[in-house]
């Protein structure tokens, strides 16, 4: 269901250095982030990792060349099963996590410990027009930021530095990157990336772009572009759930309705509930699939 939460503090800000081929993005999400964390009772360690991934998704979506959706996922076999964040070219976001809710999770646990062995990072591009693209790589690095830096260096072969942070109040991120096909003095890049490394998690989550960029680069100030506002919006719908049920097939869906009386599907992102009873399911498939599951003769329904 299309739910929206808007705040002018939920912005992404682009910047570029005129005297060196380096670009950057800053993001700070406040109301959007608070809206997301209210959907579930996230353990602190998972909440922090999800906020960092959300900020990372908004940063990376700044480089989308076509209209569409960028999806970043972290998947594992441990107590944390999945983190996922989506950011669109329309500047909407959503995010959620799945984990073993019976397991004990300490506030300071690392992402690697939560994911266990065999963790992977998945980046998916879903253009509005054209075929989707997906990249899957093993997790490399301690934390979301280092994992993304390693991924981008491997895939784009561009020097990149990323800082991410998430508190109860806000999620934030900073990305600085060499411009492609441009020559940059190693000392100049080291200077910029070293300054970026001095940014603390508290500053990133608590300060807006103007204060962050001044704090880091006041001696060589970048050119800053107009901020872009983001909002929470969930794209779930009854129609999409119907399509999913059709893919499962009438035999399986009819059997579930016989056993449970109806099918209820909850959206992981916004907690909207979609209920399909016997009448709904039969109308969806155009035949009495529930009756067939009960052993009755097959017949169509109008």
Curated annotation (Swiss-Prot):
Disulfide feature: 234-236, 267-270
Main location: cytoplasm
Keywords of the record: Chaperone, Cytoplasm, Disulfide bond, Redox-active center, Zinc
Gene3D superfamilies for this protein: helix hairpin bin, Hsp33 domain, HSP33 redox switch-like
Xref: CDD domains: Hsp33
InterPro entries recorded: Heat_shock_Hsp33, Heat_shock_Hsp33_C, Heat_shock_Hsp33_N, Hsp33_helix_hairpin_bin_dom_sf
Lineage top rank: taxon: Bacteria
One Pfam family linked to the record: HSP33
Free-text description of this protein's post-translational modifications in UniProt: Under oxidizing conditions two disulfide bonds are formed involving the reactive cysteines. Under reducing conditions zinc is bound to the reactive cysteines and the protein is inactive.
Compartments where found: Cytoplasm
GO BP terms: protein refolding
GO terms for cellular component: cytoplasm
GO MF annotation terms: protein folding chaperone; unfolded protein binding
Similarity-based family: Belongs to the HSP33 family.
NCBIfam families: PRK00114.1
Function: Redox regulated molecular chaperone. Protects both thermally unfolding and oxidatively damaged proteins from irreversible aggregation. Plays an important role in the bacterial defense system toward oxidative stress.
Protein name: 33 kDa chaperonin
